[in-house]
Amino acid sequence: VTRDDQLTAGLARVALGQFPTALEVAPRLSAEPGFPPVWVKREDLSGLALGGNKPRQLEFLMAAAMAEGAQAVITTAAAQSNFCRATAAAGARLGIRVGLLLRGTGQEALQGNLLLDRLLGADVRFIPTLDPYDTRVPGWIDDMVADYTRQGLKTHVLHLPGRTGMLGAAAMVCTGEEMARQFAAQGIQPQAVFLAAGSGLTVAGLALAFKTLGLPTRVVGISVQKQADFMVPLIVERA
């Protein structure tokens, strides 16, 4: 796929999302007393099973898997993971089997993302932990890879950190470059960008892009899992 991004031009991508997504002003919120102008990056319009910013990462991650000749990919996250749902959708589109190791008991209600995972054809299995940093997770991934290997499937693993983290952050560098073009087109220079921070990849990628492009815009991540003293070094490492 060819896009306008220059900072990651040497990395392979496969088209999965509808980009660029719009940057829209929120007129009523911006009109509130004491409020500066507020703009919203419409990642809800990215396509691919309402995947938000996940298709951006998957364009790079699935391209890497395809370059290796992968017939299957495996990833792991919470039972209602948006990333897992988007990965299942990407696999369905590209004809690649998707194995999901979801944290939980297996007794979770079949609704939301879990239902969509199954409708999209993913191989859903559960692992007995709720902690994304559980040291047993790599072993469970290895077990699933071994199972797929016995079935004759060449398998690629999507799991932080390592190459998955590097490519995921690179995808968000592209987002930062896309936003910089939109700032220029709108004639604005935002003081800060606020976003949720889970893995830290989006914060890392945006901050790296803005710094590289010489933008003064701060990137403020609101952690959804861990405290700041855990997240900050993680984000720095992934940048």
Residue ranges and their predicted role:
Residues 1-239:
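PLP-dependent amino-acid enzyme catalytic core
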